[in-house]
Amino acid sequence: MKNTKKILAGIMALTMTAALTACGDKTADGGDTSEDTTVTTTTAKTVAINEEGLKEGEEEALAGVMEQLQDVELENKTVKWLAHYDLNPSTTGASKSVGLEMFEKKYGGKVEWIPTTWGSRYNDLSTQVLGGNGVDIFPGDDTANFPKGIISGMFQPVDDYIDINSAVWQNVAAGMDLYKFGGKHYELVTSVTAEAIVIYDKSTIEAQGFDDPWELYEKGEWNWDTFKSMLYDFVDPDASQYGLDGYWNEKALLMSAGVPMIGLSADGGVQSNINDPTLEKAMNFQYELNQNGCKFPKEQFSWNEQPQMLGEGSELFYIVGPYCVQADPATWTVGIEPENLGVVPVPSPVDSDPYQGAKVNGYALCKGSANPQGAALFAECNILGSIAPEAVAISDRKSMDDYQWSQEIVDKMKAINDLANQYPVVDFAAGCSTEIASYTTDGGDQMGMRAAFDGTDWATMRETLADPIAMLVDEVDQNLKAAIDAQ
């Protein structure tokens, strides 16, 4: 194992220096991790919109939904939430979620925010858990949680606090299995949504004479081939026309084939998929796009994405998380007028199921939680908030008010999220270790999934990484199983 790590360290020394110098310290959504992220800022316009609570008739509609919740008295009404963002609207300016509305009204519950920062979140989690402070929940959509949070004793199984066979939990049973290790569930999953979407300006598509990507999707013709064809036809650097922008388009396109770098094994552990032929197909597709000039040349723009070029008509596609347009349009970075906003799922291979990288929303239950029952009931409120028609209607209205989305965009986002729920793909590289992630999903431009867009063919990269990564993942798998057995 020491020799393996020396080999990988040598590889990283050769490939990472330039990338780190050029790109800086980025989060998964392309943001800077060097600053304290405890306080979320919003525009005055957004805050003004969000000061409004439930509208006429919504109280009654919500009361009907709450009848589906367990009729119990919650002795401890406070759920302690450790995160780099608050769930309460008083500090964020965001409107109150339907799930939180129901938790407060049904159980008299409240969510106490224990603030941390993105960079210090795991150190603070360890301090809270080891100090016996009774922190209850941690963001479940953090891809670095599992399995290392189990191995380090930060998280516990949730099975003792929910009835997976109940009507409410059956709605998310498949999502629960995404974080099922050794036969135990480790997250209170509330919904599964798309990790990334493709954004485009409809006016640019029309001006080019292209078929609208959403219309192609509805006809079952939105796939790698049609995606590639549009890029080939549009890209012309001499005319300042660029193709595919985004910090994380590599991961989205990789996941769209259905196989992650590091995935679940049949026995509830983790395994390397680097030798999988489907993964190879995804990497070869990205290599082809790169060789044909489809990737946006960030190196010409101080290594930064330029999403505002979408609205200028000089960029065709931008793969990014939905958060990019979940704000007042005045703050959108894409520069697209709301009426011209186009969204569509990340395309998959021809004749493939439409796999999507999945964002698993919910809460990891902290070891030593003081209120696991409250955490589970809060999760149930959020499940119903995402599926009950009356609650969904309220959430839709909030999206239209808060983000100025049209009904068309609301409906399209639902359809994209439904795809992610039906065909979810989750990668566990970041959750295994920062070392494994740096060689597979989160490293420099010349490593792992980023190699193809840097001009390195997958066969060469696979030959370099396959055996060492397999050894590192096997070590994590053994430690995971030992930790589960010890619980």
Question: What are these model-predicted stretches?
Answer:
Residues 70, 126-128, 135-136, 164-204, ...:
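A structural signal for short loop-to-beta-strand junctions that line the ligand-binding cleft
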Residues 228-231, 266-300:
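Glycine-centered hinge/linker elements that transmit conformational signals in sensory
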Residues 9, 23-147, 389-390, 458-487:
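Conserved N-terminal structural module of periplasmic/extracytoplasmic solute-binding proteins
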Residues 44-59, 386-487:
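Conserved C-terminal helix/tail region of periplasmic/extracytoplasmic solute-binding proteins
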Residues 333-401:
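Extracytoplasmic/periplasmic substrate-recognition and gating elements
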Residues 101-171, 185, 207-209, 213, ...:
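Extracytoplasmic "Venus flytrap"/periplasmic binding protein-like
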Residues 44-75, 117, 142-195, 225, ...:
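Hinge/lid segment of periplasmic solute-binding proteins
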